[in-house]
C-alpha cells in the first residue's frame, strides 16, 4: 500500500511540474486546468488525512475532487491524467469497478501512462 501511495504522490508532483511549464491564452483551457489543479489539491489533502486515519473526511475530499475531475473531463475527454485521477478518486471511495473503467479508458488514450 505504501508503494502505491509513493507512486501516486510522485505522479502528483510530476504532473504539477508539467502543468506549470505550459502556458495557455485560452480562457477555456485555463478553466479546465483550474478544475484539474483544484482536484489535485483536494486529492493531496485527502491523502494527508488518510495518513492521520481520518478516512471519512478523506473520502469526502476524494468525492469533491471527483466532481471537479468530471467537469474537467467534460471539456477534455482525451486527457489520460484526468482519467487517472478519476479512477484514483473513485477507487478511494470504494467504487472499484468504476475506477477500473476510468483507468482502462485512460490507458486506451495513452497505453504507457506512468500513473495508470
Where do the language-model regions lie?
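Start-of-helix register in tetratricopeptide repeats
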Residues: 33, 81, 114-115
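Canonical positions in the second alpha-helix
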Residues: 72, 105-106
